From Swiss-Prot:
Protein name per Swiss-Prot or TrEMBL: Protein adenylyltransferase Fic
Span of domain Fido: 297-432
Any single GO CC term annotated in Swiss-Prot or TrEMBL for this entry: plasma membrane
Organism encoding this protein: Drosophila sechellia
Function recorded in the entry: Protein that can both mediate the addition of adenosine 5'-monophosphate (AMP) to specific residues of target proteins (AMPylation), and the removal of the same modification from target proteins (de-AMPylation), depending on the context. The side chain of Glu-247 determines which of the two opposing activities (AMPylase or de-AMPylase) will take place. Acts as a key regulator of the unfolded protein response (UPR) by mediating AMPylation or de-AMPylation of Hsc70-3/BiP.
Swiss-Prot/TrEMBL TPR repeat ranges: 118-151, 152-186
Subunit structure: Homodimer.
């Protein structure tokens, strides 16, 4: 029974039907609504908890994949052999969303100005191209690319110009690929890539076959050949000189040779610069004595290699994984807590059955990139990665490849492109260096009239004059070698 104070004023219809009046305290509507809200909240919490628990493993894997090149960097089977199809699809959605978010991000005022100017230059370049003024069009295309190097429209149109006007299908395909990594839904870039991808792959394969032919020609020269022995000795000095030079060492080639031959100090140079050269010497001797003949390369081998690289510079850090976070330009390597896992994965990849089916140059270049991307050490990552690359090449019958220090900017540019999604330009760069090294060996051991391969030049006129010389005599050979040893200039 309701008290008088609780009595409501029921509608007349309810009273006529004889239904007893409801008290406010007995009204079921608020209680029912309250129960529904509780059920909804509980259901939402349960669904969220289930989703979080079921996706924890995938999220952890995605976090680990952030630290190593993804399928957009390397071949899918290189990195995703341990993941299911569902996880791969989830990662693809994760990647595509992150790309879309980055494309949709707001630009700074300066970036907006550059993009506006770049698109204007792009329209002018297309008009000039249609008018037959190819040279002016090329300069404007390059200007647009410099202003907006990651704008899909600029990459796409410049790629089309390179493909159809310059007949440079390899570089055109590279720009189409870049456009797709930035804008995966770009139908024009996708159509262009479908047209060029197979052609470019065929060209790359033919290039590798050519390298194999030159390697076989070099392998046919007997070890007792005096010219070959001299070329190997010279290449040894060159390799150390250029590898430490890439990292900023200021020693000249003559000074590097003097330190290695006499073990005497060079006036005016720091102790660290001396020790960097001696460390590389120790590491290369370790490769020749131990690693070239090994079947598998292990983490321990890489640590021993690094221990020698830093043996004279920083013996405490040599052969040890870093314990702090490092930053390399725009690249943020994985944290120290992730290094053990990533290096174990790297070791498995190095010795996997699939890796053994890769062409030696591809395999060595990929190993170089993977290791430098993990960046497991405080210092010496680049030198150790290049030494590992040459170890793998030497096991396949190739000579140690020289990456000239004058190519430092290109070297880092191609590594940056790999970080952005396309490893192929870096592999081609390593193939270029491999071919130049092979050409020098073959020329040094040949008495047949042929064009002289020039690896380094100081000025264009001298480079052209020397490159045009046929069948050089002894004096000419000597002058060319001195010219090469000067250590300045660029790869033509």
């Amino acid at each position: 029974m309701c008290t008088e104070a609780e009595q409501p004023s029921p509608p007349a219809q309810q009273q006529e039907q004889g239904n007893p009046p409801l008290c406010k305290a007995q009204n079921p509507k608020p209680a029912r609504l309250y129960r529904l809200v509780l059920l909804f909240v509980a259901g939402s919490l349960a669904a969220w908890t289930f989703h979080a628990l079921s996706s924890t493993n995938l999220v952890w894997k995605l976090r680990q994949l952030h630290h190593l090149p993804t399928a957009h960097y390397l071949q899918t089977r290189d990195e995703f052999a341990l993941y299911s199809v569902e996880e791969l699809n989830a990662f693809k959605e994760f990647y595509d969303k992150s790309v879309s978010d980055s494309v949709g991000a707001s630009y700074t005022e300066a970036e907006q100005t550059n993009i506006k100017e770049a698109l204007g230059a792009l329209r002018m370049a297309q008009d000039l191209y249609l008018a037959g003024k190819d040279d002016k069009a090329a300069r404007l295309f390059e200007h647009a690319l410099a202003l907006a190097p990651r704008h899909p429209e600029v990459l796409l149109r410049y790629g089309e110009f390179l493909e159809h006007n310059q007949r440079n299908i390899v570089l055109a395909d590279q720009y189409y690929f870049q456009a797709l990594t930035i804008s995966p839904s770009n139908s024009e870039a996708l159509a262009n890539r479908q047209r060029t991808a197979d052609v470019v792959q065929s060209l790359d394969e033919r290039r590798l076959e050519s390298l194999d032919s030159k390697r076989d020609a070099l392998s046919a020269i007997h070890e007792s050949n005096g010219a070959l022995r001299r070329a190997k000795k010279e290449a040894y000095f060159q390799h150390i000189y250029h590898s430490v030079g890439i990292e900023g060492n200021t020693m000249t080639l003559a000074q590097t040779r003097s330190i290695l031959e006499t073990r005497m100090a060079v006036d005016g140079k720091s102790i660290d610069e001396h020790n960097e050269i001696l460390g590389m010497d120790l590491a290369m001797k370790y490769i020749n004595a131990s690693l070239v003949q090994k079947i598998d390369i292990t983490i321990k081998d890489i640590l021993e290699l690094h221990r020698r690289v830093l043996g004279h510079v920083d013996p405490i850090e040599g052969g040890e994984f870093r314990r702090n976070q490092v930053y390399v330009g725009g690249h943020i390597p994985p944290g120290p807590g992730d290094l053990a896992l990533l290096m174990q994965r790297f070791e498995r990849w190095l010795n996997s059955e699939h890796s053994s089916t890769l062409h030696p140059v591809n395999y060595a270049a990929l190993a170089h990139y993977k290791l430098v991307h993990i960046h497991p050490f405080v210092d010496g990552n680049g030198r150790t990665s290049r030494l590992l690359m040459n170890t793998l090449l030497m096991r396949a019958g190739y000579p140690p490849v020289i990456i000239p220090k004058q190519q430092r900017s290109k070297y880092y540019h191609f590594l940056k492109l790999a970080n952005e999604g396309d490893i192929r330009p870096f592999v081609r760069f390593i193939a270029d260096c491999t071919e130049k090294t092979l050409d020098l060996y073959l020329w040094a051991t040949s008495d047949l009239p042929q064009q002289i391969p020039m690896l380094i030049q100081t000025e264009s006129e001298a480079g052209e004059r020397l490159a045009q010389m046929q069948s050089p005599n002894v004096a000419q050979r000597s002058s060319i070698l001195e010219f090469y040893e000067s250590g300045s200039g660029d790869i033509p």
